[in-house]
Amino acid sequence: MQRSMKRLARNARRISISAIYTGAAVMLCAHSAKAEFITLSDFDNTAVVTDLNSLGVPTPHIFATPLKVGIYMFTTDSGQLGYGASGLNNSNALSTTTDLGWMRIDIAPSAQVTKFGLLVGLPGPQQHNHEAVLFFDDYNHLLGGTGVSRRGGFQFVAFENTEGLIGSVLIQDADLNSSSFVVDNLVSQSHRP
């Protein structure tokens, strides 16, 4: 009896793992048909770049969140956003204010954004960083996620939802390095009917 219980438990574990992998594969296949990662070259001349250079305050500056910039609403884990010359080519950009912090960027549904991308990272070649970047549709369903891992500088991360809208992006600092992370040059494009 005890032997058959052990066999049942071992088989149940195999079945559970198999069910998890199968379910994950089905979910990925379902989403891959309507959403995918893209590059900067996938945006056309109707794309709008929000470079965050001129938010109307002297720098450096700390903003309370939520902070609205055009079609974007920024929130963070700490309730604050740093603003200063930490962006691409030392331009002004927004950053978290805590190590291992997160930043959520909600996109106004009225903007009808189907493609969205941004630069994520830290300035300078010696600023090692890791971030998880998750894209959501306008119903807060996960479209996809990726990791950014660099020895310094920025990486452009972008996503397209071909069957709906991009609703938000969540960036999570994943590197315990006593540093925050920076976002710059938000790129959006809409295909309105």
Model segments located where?
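Generic detector of short alpha-helix boundary/capping microenvironments
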Residues: 11, 23, 105-109
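N-terminal secretory signal peptides that target proteins for export/translocation
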Residues: 1-14
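Bacterial N-terminal signal peptides
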Residues: 17-27
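Surface-exposed, well-ordered secondary-structure segments
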Residues: 34-190
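N-terminal signal peptide c-region/cleavage motif recognized by signal peptidases
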Residues: 30-32
